[in-house]
Amino acid sequence: MFYGFKNASHVCSRHRGKMLISGAEISRVEDSVKRICNAYDVKRIDVFTITSSMVATLEDKDGNSITETRRITKHHTDLTKLHKLNDLSRKIVRRVPDIHYIRNQIDEIEKGTKEYNLPIQCTVSALIAGAFAIFFGGAFLDGIAAALIGIVLKLIVYATEKTQVNMIFANVVCSFAVCSIAFAFVMLGFGYSTDKIIIGNIMLLIPGVALTNSIRDMISGDIMAGMLRFCEACLVSLAIAAGYIIAALIFGGIGK
């Protein structure tokens, strides 16, 4: 019994952490924890999860209890990894495997799910920025300018992620860089509409997934977790606006 109890504790700690980091909803993370624990005949499960921390207390039929706490310091959206983790949780519930199998599976998911390389990310960033600039009414030249700035933006984002710069400061820097280059391009004649070029790139920074997940968390009853994620999305939005305002003040773009 205690062996199965340790299995459940180990799985919950690693599995839920990977899910939350990959962009899973709070309710989905907690539901997976409870299902896995039930598969290992855990008598009582108390789970508390927010965007930056997770706590789970497990109690077996003999009264033994284990509390696992994990601090979450980074978030990103990785749907491939999330799909594999969800599939693994279903296998765990069906088969109740030993600890070595679970550890190996989680390690394989971590190693086998790799990010796209930087050139591909820059290419996609350029295509998205250019497409949005034209979609919102910009000329073809505005789209080209937005695409070039999109490459620069991705390089800045990549650098801030590698150096682990504070999220709010990183968004201020990214927004300021995007807006400054956009103003400079238009002044040099490489583009017609500053706002369209800026909008095309700002769309890459908007925390749409975080905002959507926060609303879903609140609807599902996780008010605290939803509010924290909502506040995080609002702070990111304010940081983006701050970067634009600084650039506009320097280049005299406010009110034009």
PLM features per residue range, with description:
Residues 1-97:
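Soluble N-terminal domains of membrane-associated systems
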Residues 105-109, 153-164, 212-225:
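C-terminal ends of transmembrane helices
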Residues 74-128, 133-142, 232-241, 252:
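Alpha-helical transmembrane segments and their cytosolic membrane-interface
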Residues 17, 21, 38-42, 90, ...:
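Generic secondary-structure signature for well-ordered alpha-helical cores
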Residues 115-189:
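Core alpha-helical transmembrane segments of integral membrane proteins
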Residues 187-256:
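Generic detector of multi-pass transmembrane helix bundles and their immediately adjacent loops
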